[in-house]
Regions:
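N-terminal cap/lid segment of alpha/beta-hydrolase-fold proteins
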Residues: 1-18
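Conserved alpha/beta-hydrolase
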Residues: 41-63
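Active-site glycine-rich loops that stabilize anionic/oxyanionic intermediates
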Residues: 21, 29-32, 183
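Structural cue for short, hydrophobic secondary-structure segments
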Residues: 26-29, 53
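The serine-hydrolase catalytic nucleophile loop
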Residues: 30-42, 191
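Catalytic nucleophile-loop/oxyanion-hole region of alpha/beta-hydrolase
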Residues: 59-88
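Gly/Ala-rich beta-loop-alpha elbow adjacent to hydrolase catalytic centers
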Residues: 95-104
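The alpha/beta-hydrolase serine catalytic core
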Residues: 111-195, 199-206, 211-214, 220-233
Length: 233
């Protein structure tokens, strides 16, 4: 398929396929990059969609950035890509995975998109942070005092990030949404996902033996079938 590298207002991006009236913005999670949207792009191209993927802060071409993967930075950059998508296509949808889903919830809380597909979404970052603090006996006062606290899980807790997340709970979501969740997801609690789905009338599919990171042959095949089923011409 056609694959065009570009910069959208300074953000390293790829446009997959040919320009069309229907566009998906692909928003990846931690440890991923814009190139990993290829499988998704190949599937939805057959349904008449183009796809824009981009590197989130500290990922892909931006791997050497430091301390830029903050919600306010991510929102600003998703908005840049969204504005560009609007300039070329009247119908905008999103595909987001893991932390990318959380950043999407913040960015588009007041906007009704055509549709959203969430894979292994982080839907309540407050809860995830609190769980991490509980496991490693870290208090809010310690985070505020030290500014940043590395954890054995490889995740560093920052005071500015913590304060932002606590001040911005997810209370609104207007976009018709479908969620694919793995039975053995170790980051997103099933109850959090089901509560979100019930609250915002989302479709939810559970993959038996699925994980947070869909990477095995069986998992990717299941994911592909899920996308193919939900995205129509």
């Amino acid at each position: 398929m056609k694959k065009q590298y570009c910069y959208i207002d300074g953000v390293p991006s790829i446009y997959w396929g040919n320009p069309t009236e229907k566009t998906f913005i692909s928003i990846h999670g931690v440890g991923s990059n814009k190139e990993e949207a290829e499988l998704f792009a190949r599937i939805v191209e057959t349904k008449g969609y183009g796809v824009i993927s981009f590197d989130m802060p500290e990922h892909g071409e931006r791997i050497n950035e430091k301390n830029t993967l903050r919600p306010w930075n991510c929102i600003e950059e998703i908005e840049k890509v969204y504005r560009y998508a609007q300039s070329i296509s009247p119908n905008i949808s999103i595909f987001a995975s893991s932390l990318g889903a959380y950043m999407s919830l913040l960015t588009f809380s007041e906007i009704k998109l055509e549709k959203a597909l969430f894979l292994s979404p982080i839907l309540d970052l407050q809860r995830l942070i609190w769980n991490l603090m509980s496991v490693y006996n870290i208090t809010e006062a310690e985070i505020m005092e030290k500014g940043e606290i590395p954890t054995p899980a490889g995740i560093t807790l920052y005071d500015d990030y913590y304060k932002y997340v606590m001040a911005h709970p997810i209370t609104k979501w207007k976009t018709p949404t479908e969620i694919l969740y793995g039975e053995h997801d170790n980051l997103s609690e099933y109850k959090i996902v089901t509560d979100f789905a019930d609250r915002f009338d989302c479709g939810l599919e559970l993959m038996k033996n699925g994980e947070h990171w869909f990477h095995t042959e069986d998992q990717l095949a299941y994911f592909s079938d899920w996308v193919d089923k939900l995205v129509t011409d």
